[in-house]
């Protein structure tokens, strides 16, 4: 009986080793767990009515995403990565990149103060205090950035910060393609 008990930890260790090895093989075969697909790719931004971050009572709906290609950047003051990407978003906006901000599950006063202090790269800042639009978009956390075409259709989802590397390699070429399509 005692010998059988000694095998239980060995069996548990072997099971964990198999699970670990399986995950390593999955990651090597291209199944990247950091890539979060969106069911909204190819679909219009979901319907919503949200207030402007700085002007409570001023409402916007999904029509703000129609007319020209743009980025929808999901951000919050509680998000350290959002802080890290913010100066780069300011640079992109200064270069003419159209960006709408979605302030996600945040304190409105802190968010307004953040933009006043760090600069505001957003054409419009939507306030999603309860996270309902974020939920409809499938947001897991902040930051996330969506490429939206001129018809209000989600074309790409980027999880994590927008930085010079991923902007140049992935996001900018896609954004430029959307600008060409819109002509």
Predicted features and spans:
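N-terminal targeting signals for export/organelle localization
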Residues: 1-51
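Short gly/ser/thr-rich secondary-structure transition/capping motifs
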Residues: 29-31, 51-58, 125-128
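Short pre-active-site segment immediately N-terminal to redox-active cysteine/selenocysteine motifs
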Residues: 44, 68-70, 74-78, 141
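Conserved Rossmann-like nucleotide-binding pocket used by diverse enzymes
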Residues: 46-49, 75, 100, 135
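A short beta-strand-turn-helix
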Residues: 48-70
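Hydrophobic beta-strand anchors of alpha/beta hydrolase catalytic cores
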Residues: 71-72, 99, 145
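Structural microenvironment flanking redox-active thiols in thiol-disulfide oxidoreductases
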Residues: 83-119, 129-136
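Thiol/disulfide oxidoreductase modules built on the thioredoxin-like
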Residues: 116-121, 128-179
């Amino acid at each position: 009986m005692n010998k059988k008990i000694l095998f239980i930890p060995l069996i548990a260790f072997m099971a964990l080793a198999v699970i670990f090895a399986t995950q390593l093989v999955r990651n090597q075969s291209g199944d990247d767990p950091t890539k979060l697909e969106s069911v909204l790719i190819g679909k219009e931004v979901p319907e919503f009515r949200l207030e402007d971050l700085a002007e409570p009572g001023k409402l916007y709906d999904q029509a703000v995403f129609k007319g020209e290609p743009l980025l929808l950047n999901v951000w919050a003051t509680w998000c350290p990565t959002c802080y890290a990407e913010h100066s780069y978003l300011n640079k992109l906006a200064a270069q003419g990149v159209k960006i709408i901000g979605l302030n996600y599950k945040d304190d409105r006063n802190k968010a307004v103060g953040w933009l006043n202090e760090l600069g505001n790269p957003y054409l419009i800042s939507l306030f999603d205090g309860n996270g309902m639009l974020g939920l409809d978009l499938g947001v897991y956390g902040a930051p996330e950035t969506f490429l939206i075409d001129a018809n209000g259709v989600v074309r790409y989802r980027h999880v994590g910060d927008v930085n010079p590397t991923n902007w140049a390699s992935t996001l900018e070429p896609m954004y430029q393609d959307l600008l060409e399509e819109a002509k």
